[in-house]
């Protein structure tokens, strides 16, 4: 019985990862200074954005999301000209690795981050799916091992 429960939990978690792979959306918004809801910290989730003007969760064919920070030399938070834009990008880096780096975008020097995952461009740190799977699996594995040791 315990093994069946563990097996069902594993199948459920694998299906969650598969679902994440099928649907890729990105946040789309832009803020400048204190104007707009796109600035950091970005506190919205997939359901919140439906109520927030100027912020949307859009389907992204490439699966790659981006975040661009423009202005302020060192990108200081208190800079009036600091602009943050979140978007779907047509294609990610050539090596398919999530990353952030200084680059040129629309003829301006910016700090740009690329990530691949559903709504990944809203988070400060990229995808948390592997950590969530590990956190969920450890108690299940521990329970299963204890059951095996008792029998």
Swiss-Prot record:
Main location per the UniProt record: membrane
Subcellular location: Cell membrane
UniProt keyword Protease present: no
UniProt KW keywords: Cell membrane, Disulfide bond, Glycoprotein, GPI-anchor, Lipoprotein, Membrane, Signal, Transmembrane, Transmembrane helix
Membrane topology, as annotated: Lipid-anchor; GPI-anchor
InterPro entries: QVR-like, Sleep_regulator
GO CC annotations on file: plasma membrane; side of membrane
Residues bearing carbohydrate: 45
Extracellular side of membrane: 20-125
Disruption phenotype: Larval lethal as larvae are unable to hatch. Larvae are hyperactive and occasionally change orientation in the egg case. Tissues that produce a chitin cuticle, such as the skull and the trachea, fail to form properly. Disorganization of chitin fibers in the cuticle and in the trachea. Elongated and convoluted tracheal dorsal trunk with tracheal lumen expansion defects in stage 14 to 16 embryos, possibly due to uncoordinated apical cell surface expansion. Detachment of the cuticle from the underlying epidermis allowing it to expand giving a bloated phenotype.
Residue ranges that the UniProt entry lists as topological domain Cytoplasmic: 147-151
Function: Required for chitin fiber assembly and organization involved in cuticle formation and tracheal development.
Record family assignment: Belongs to the quiver family.
Anything else known: The name 'retroactive' likely refers to the propensity of hyperactive larvae to change orientation within the egg case.
Protein's name in the database: UPAR/Ly6 domain-containing protein rtv
